[in-house]
């Protein structure tokens, strides 16, 4: 086939047309940026995608390198839970019973009147009015009245309480029975003198058997028979204080033997120091028998002395008195003669926090250790 023949010319034109069509297809397929979208779709069908895949991983590395969100576990919550676990430790000394706070204090192991800080006390955390009254040797009701504290006796940390008088001694404690002793001692002195004294202008003073309601400082003369009336007439220039024959309990006859006033363990001993216990405390059960420690006469039976509850005082002779406090029921009356071992009361908790007997012996108005007189057991 010659180059100038028509057939050759047609064949050449057809070949050129095919080449041009092929070239047109190549140029049209290279225009769209398909490799960019194939990075996200994961397509690898284009041969050019291998050259364009490398930039997107770099971009993906920069965008995916934000794992700052991983520390968003918020470790701040850990220190919040730890302090909450330590709070019950601070509350261990306190118990709740029936909605009330109960402090774990064993008053039998706490010396009564052991506070030596003077006439004031500063309230600390966990203090109660009864606890402060206990360690300062006071009655909690007197302490509340002295400091104008009303029920339920709420206290504030740092609050200052007056717990003693000007001399630093407790408001109550041993002072009450000491005053009763002084009243009795004055009567005994006048009886022993058997003298005649001048009487100035004064009203007639009468003591009778019904005077048991008066306070311990105005008790019946202990050497008078029950029902005797003593008068001091205003018109008489003098009055004789000569007493009738007194019974054996008003003499200085020695006491042959002392008896334990009740059974039980001594939970608080005698304290000779200032503000210490003026007798001994014996534990027991409510209703337990209380007996007279020796023969004598009841010179006081009542509850006028705060801090002692139902109190009985027995005069044994001119020198000795015995006192029985916190009784539940008193079975004797003032001016009644009693024998050693005679039941005079039942044990209780009046004026105190637990069932017990507070027992004292006084010699010439001074507190003495009852354990020196009671038989060993």
Curated annotation (Swiss-Prot):
<keyword id="KW-0677">Repeat</keyword>
<dbReference type="GO" id="GO:0009279">
    <property type="term" value="C:cell outer membrane"/>
</dbReference>
<dbReference type="GO" id="GO:0051301">
    <property type="term" value="P:cell division"/>
</dbReference>
<feature type="compositionally biased region" description="Low complexity">
    <location>
        <begin position="36"/>
        <end position="50"/>
    </location>
</feature>
<dbReference type="InterPro" id="IPR050570">
    <property type="entry name" value="Cell_wall_metabolism_enzyme"/>
</dbReference>
<dbReference type="GO" id="GO:0032153">
    <property type="term" value="C:cell division site"/>
</dbReference>
<dbReference type="GO" id="GO:0005886">
    <property type="term" value="C:plasma membrane"/>
</dbReference>
<feature type="region of interest" description="Disordered">
    <location>
        <begin position="30"/>
        <end position="93"/>
    </location>
</feature>
<dbReference type="InterPro" id="IPR016047">
    <property type="entry name" value="Peptidase_M23"/>
</dbReference>
<comment type="function">
    <text>Activator of the cell wall hydrolase AmiC. Required for septal murein cleavage and daughter cell separation during cell division.</text>
</comment>
<keyword id="KW-0732">Signal</keyword>
<feature type="compositionally biased region" description="Polar residues">
    <location>
        <begin position="79"/>
        <end position="93"/>
    </location>
</feature>
<keyword id="KW-0997">Cell inner membrane</keyword>
<protein>
    <recommendedName>
        <fullName>Murein hydrolase activator NlpD</fullName>
    </recommendedName>
</protein>
<feature type="repeat" description="3">
    <location>
        <begin position="237"/>
        <end position="243"/>
    </location>
</feature>
<dbReference type="InterPro" id="IPR018392">
    <property type="entry name" value="LysM_dom"/>
</dbReference>
<keyword id="KW-1003">Cell membrane</keyword>
<feature type="lipid moiety-binding region" description="N-palmitoyl cysteine">
    <location>
        <position position="26"/>
    </location>
</feature>
<feature type="repeat" description="1">
    <location>
        <begin position="203"/>
        <end position="209"/>
    </location>
</feature>
<comment type="similarity">
    <text>Belongs to the E.coli NlpD/Haemophilus LppB family.</text>
</comment>
<feature type="region of interest" description="4 X 7 AA approximate repeats">
    <location>
        <begin position="203"/>
        <end position="250"/>
    </location>
</feature>
<dbReference type="Pfam" id="PF01551">
    <property type="entry name" value="Peptidase_M23"/>
</dbReference>
<keyword id="KW-0132">Cell division</keyword>
<keyword id="KW-0131">Cell cycle</keyword>
<dbReference type="GO" id="GO:0004222">
    <property type="term" value="F:metalloendopeptidase activity"/>
</dbReference>
<feature type="repeat" description="2">
    <location>
        <begin position="225"/>
        <end position="231"/>
    </location>
</feature>
<feature type="compositionally biased region" description="Low complexity">
    <location>
        <begin position="62"/>
        <end position="77"/>
    </location>
</feature>
<keyword id="KW-0449">Lipoprotein</keyword>
<feature type="lipid moiety-binding region" description="S-diacylglycerol cysteine">
    <location>
        <position position="26"/>
    </location>
</feature>
<feature type="signal peptide">
    <location>
        <begin position="1"/>
        <end position="25"/>
    </location>
</feature>
<keyword id="KW-0564">Palmitate</keyword>
<feature type="repeat" description="4">
    <location>
        <begin position="244"/>
        <end position="250"/>
    </location>
</feature>
<dbReference type="InterPro" id="IPR036779">
    <property type="entry name" value="LysM_dom_sf"/>
</dbReference>
<keyword id="KW-0472">Membrane</keyword>
<feature type="domain" description="LysM">
    <location>
        <begin position="119"/>
        <end position="163"/>
    </location>
</feature>
<dbReference type="Pfam" id="PF01476">
    <property type="entry name" value="LysM"/>
</dbReference>
<dbReference type="InterPro" id="IPR011055">
    <property type="entry name" value="Dup_hybrid_motif"/>
</dbReference>
């Amino acid at each position: 086939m010659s180059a100038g023949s028509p057939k050759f010319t047609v064949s050449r034109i057809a070949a050129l047309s095919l080449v041009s069509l092929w070239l047109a297809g190549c140029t049209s397929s290279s225009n769209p940026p398909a490799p960019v979208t194939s990075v996200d779709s994961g397509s690898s069908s284009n041969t050019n995608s291998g050259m364009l895949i490398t930039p997107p991983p770099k971009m993906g590395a920069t965008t995916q390198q934000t794992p700052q969100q991983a520390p968003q576990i918020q470790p701040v919550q850990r220190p919040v839970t730890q302090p909450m676990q330590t709070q019950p430790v601070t509350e261990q000394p306190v118990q709740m019973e029936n909605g009330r706070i109960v402090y774990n204090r064993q008053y039998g192991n706490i010396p009564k009147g052991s506070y030596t800080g003077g006439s004031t006390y500063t309230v600390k955390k966990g203090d109660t009015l009864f606890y402060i009254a206990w360690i300062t040797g006071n009655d909690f009701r007197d302490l509340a009245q002295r400091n104008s504290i009303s029920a339920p006796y709420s206290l504030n940390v740092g609050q200052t309480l007056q717990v003693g008088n000007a001399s630093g001694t407790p408001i109550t404690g041993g002072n009450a029975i000491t005053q009763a002793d002084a009243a009795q001692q004055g009567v005994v002195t006048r009886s022993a003198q058997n003298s005649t004294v001048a009487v100035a202008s004064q009203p007639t003073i009468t003591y009778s058997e019904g005077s048991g309601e008066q306070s311990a400082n105005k008790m019946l003369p202990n050497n008078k028979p029950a029902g005797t009336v003593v008068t001091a007439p205003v018109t008489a220039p003098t009055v004789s204080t000569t007493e009738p024959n007194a019974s054996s309990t008003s003499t200085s006859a020695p006491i042959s033997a002392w008896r334990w006033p009740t059974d039980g363990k001594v939970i608080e001993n005698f304290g000779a120091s200032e503000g210490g216990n003026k007798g001994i405390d014996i534990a027991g059960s409510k209703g337990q028998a209380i007996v007279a420690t020796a023969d004598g006469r009841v010179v006081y039976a009542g509850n006028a002395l705060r801090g002692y509850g139902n109190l009985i005082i027995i005069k044994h002779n001119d020198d000795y008195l015995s006192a029985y406090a916190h009784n539940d029921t008193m079975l004797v009356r003032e001016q009644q003669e009693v024998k050693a071992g005679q039941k005079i009361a039942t044990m209780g908790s009046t004026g105190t926090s637990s069932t017990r007997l507070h027992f004292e012996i006084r010699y010439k108005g001074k507190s003495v250790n009852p354990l020196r007189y009671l038989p060993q057991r």
